Amino acid sequence: MGVTVVSHPLVQHKLTIMRKKETSTASFRRLLKEISLLLCYEVTRNLELTTMSIETPLMPMEAPVLEGKKLVFASILRAGNGLLEGMLDLVPAARVAHIGLYRDHDTLQPIEYYFKAPEDIVNRLVIVVDPMLATANSAIAAIDKLKERGATNIRFLCLLAAPEGIERFTKAHPDVEVFTASIDECLDEKGYIVPGLGDAGDRMYGTK
């Protein structure tokens, strides 16, 4: 399906501020919510529409509305929730899935500790959100789980991606399109994206 880099000037400006090491936790969290609105706009750009009959104060008309079942936003905990908040402001009727994964710092492999999703995700568009696509291990594991539950129409949304992560992800799930604000240089020896912005979860919650 490929990779879409969202190059909108507002996205890039806000991302630069988020990258700065002196940006405060409060500012980082606010910027993440703001940028999630802009990214959500892009990832939902080609949703299908139908029409319904309504009445304006002046006359009846056929007006466009979203077709099909409501979206599912699937957040990879915990950092994914930073993107989720803004996206729910934009699409408040969306269903939500939570996927609890943490990365073993020695093996860099994901360990699942929580999974909760709507039962009827088979015919829904599922947008998986996680700020970072680094090794891609967590993203691949999350989408493996969603596909086990029957999801077939999936997109992945992140702030930053590493070339190594994109390569692994697209090999594992070639049917899932990736949306990101930036493809950075590479991964370092600890599996962090560089130049990156640090650990998104730690910067969002003020933890180490």
Swiss-Prot record:
Binding locations of 5-phospho-alpha-D-ribose 1-diphosphate: 78, 103, 130-138, 199
InterPro entries: PRibTrfase_dom, PRTase-like, Upp_B, UPRTase/APRTase, Ura_phspho_trans
GO biological process: UMP salvage; uracil salvage
Catalytic activity as recorded in UniProt: UMP + diphosphate = 5-phospho-alpha-D-ribose 1-diphosphate + uracil
Entry cofactors: Mg(2+)
Co-factor binding details: Binds 1 Mg(2+) ion per subunit. The magnesium is bound as Mg-PRPP.
This protein's UniProt keywords: Allosteric enzyme, Glycosyltransferase, GTP-binding, Magnesium, Nucleotide-binding, Transferase
List of residues binding uracil: 193, 198-200
Known EC number: 2.4.2.9
Molecular function per GO: GTP binding; magnesium ion binding; uracil phosphoribosyltransferase activity
Family recorded in the similarity comment: Belongs to the UPRTase family.
The protein's name: Uracil phosphoribosyltransferase
Organism: Brucella melitensis biotype 2 (strain ATCC 23457)
